[in-house]
Amino acid sequence: AAIAAGHVMGVVEPLDCGVAAGGFMTIHCSSRNKTEVIDFLGTAPASAKYELYAINDINGDYTIRVEGQHNQIGYRSIATPGTLRGFEEGHKKYGSLPMHELIAPAISIAKEGFPISYKGALRMARTAHILATTDACRNLYLKSDNSAPREGEIIQNKDYAYTLEEIAKYGADTFYSGDLARFIVNEIDKNYGFLTKDDLLKYKAIWRKPSHFNYNGLDILTPPPPSSGSLVFSGLEALTLDNKSHSAHQLLAEAMLKMFSK
């Protein structure tokens, strides 16, 4: 169910996830009382060196301004995707249904279209200038005047449906070493990106032990670093303050301060 939902989210929340993304999967097996984590974060291509990004300026805060925002926008910002290898690892060990059945709902939604959510419409409105930087992205998500779709408007993504169909037929290997891999690498190469066929071929998801924290008598388990799971621990620690002498707003502020000041 988690993998099926993950694929659907890649269709309906394309700015947050998808087959070319990455992340973590925390799995608890109740019959074995065991919790495991799969780390499938994207990794930097081997040829993506720090010195290849031209620095505009370094501000007084933690931000570094890169010329053209090439570390965030465009082909030089693309990491080696991990989602499909992560899903594959989880499915091999814990899956019960065939992978193609788990991908089928996402294929159907991408073909038929879906009403964009309030959150999705807001995100696209805020990033319309970025979505307009390539013809493919602009034609898919923006209107003729480069404005973003409004909540409830229908978006179709038939090319993504085709990609998912290929993955359903041939597995994740087509994305990392097959026809899809060749298409991805050719597109990135002609646009001076860093991702190569070797980056895709060598990518592996990693099984990790979860981080463990006890809060109010409960065992909390989250992905370990490099995830932000430790921030959850920090926030929960702040919530152990004397509730009688702190308002809910103050507790929340203290929790967020502790989380993001580390």
Pin down the residues of each PLM region.
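Serine/threonine-rich low-complexity intrinsically disordered regions
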Residues: 150, 196, 240-247
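Regular secondary-structure segments
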Residues: 165-168, 240, 260
